[in-house]
């Protein structure tokens, strides 16, 4: 009996040891299993890693990228960053002198922010850009095609202050200075004075052969030319900047009146220097078609 109990106790002990061995093996197996990867939706961002960006920041980056791409395509790559800085500087100067143009540039900026891959947004930006720059582009093109000789164009551009390294890049002052030189005393006065002096005799000899309406226009031309010459003859070396500007505006107004009256007689217009030939239309003084008098020239 005692022997039987001893055999039974040994069996129980063996079963316990086997159970412990199996449990230890299971524990080791569980430890060896790879832990599941953390869910990306609940993992906390690393402090040194990129932070979550707001929709506003994303839109701003898209606008800057669009602007950078625009300047990269418009200018050489080395001038793109300079063009951006010059554009901002030009806008500050423009806001003081031409607020209505600033409104157009604001519309242009808003359109640029909406530029996308679709044809509609690209067309909107292109249309706004053309509207904003049409006057400047039209003047520049007309001046290039006006038939002026190289010497006369060089003379007209003297004094623009476009020295090397100037870096202004502001088209508005350049166009203003160019128009002031084209309508200066040195360019216009000699020929206008000669025509004015010869006009009375020509009118007298052609009075009977010219229709009354056209003859009246020629008389008005003679009068306006005389007023322009008077403006130039009033110039003095001591004139202030305000006086120069007022005289320029007066001459510009008279030149527009002269253009409205049509071309002078060919016999008299032939006295104009080669290249100019009194072609006021080539100077585009009246601005784009459909523009009113107040918008005829950007100044």
Curated annotation (Swiss-Prot):
It holds the Pfam family Pex19. The modification Cysteine methyl ester is found at residue 296. Necessary for early peroxisomal biogenesis. Acts both as a cytosolic chaperone and as an import receptor for peroxisomal membrane proteins (PMPs). Binds and stabilizes newly synthesized PMPs in the cytoplasm by interacting with their hydrophobic membrane-spanning domains, and targets them to the peroxisome membrane by binding to the integral membrane protein PEX3. Excludes CDKN2A from the nucleus and prevents its interaction with MDM2, which results in active degradation of TP53. Residues 2-56 are annotated as: Docking to the peroxisome membrane and binding to PEX3. Belongs to the peroxin-19 family. GO terms for molecular function: ATPase binding; peroxisome membrane class-1 targeting sequence binding; peroxisome membrane targeting sequence binding; protein carrier chaperone. The modification Phosphoserine is found at residues 35, 39, 54, 66. The keyword NADP does not apply. This is Peroxisomal biogenesis factor 19. Keywords: Acetylation, Cytoplasm, Lipoprotein, Membrane, Methylation, Peroxisome, Peroxisome biogenesis, Phosphoprotein, Prenylation. Residues 297-299 form a propeptide. It comes from Rattus norvegicus. PANTHER family: PEROXISOMAL BIOGENESIS FACTOR 19. It is a lipid-anchor.
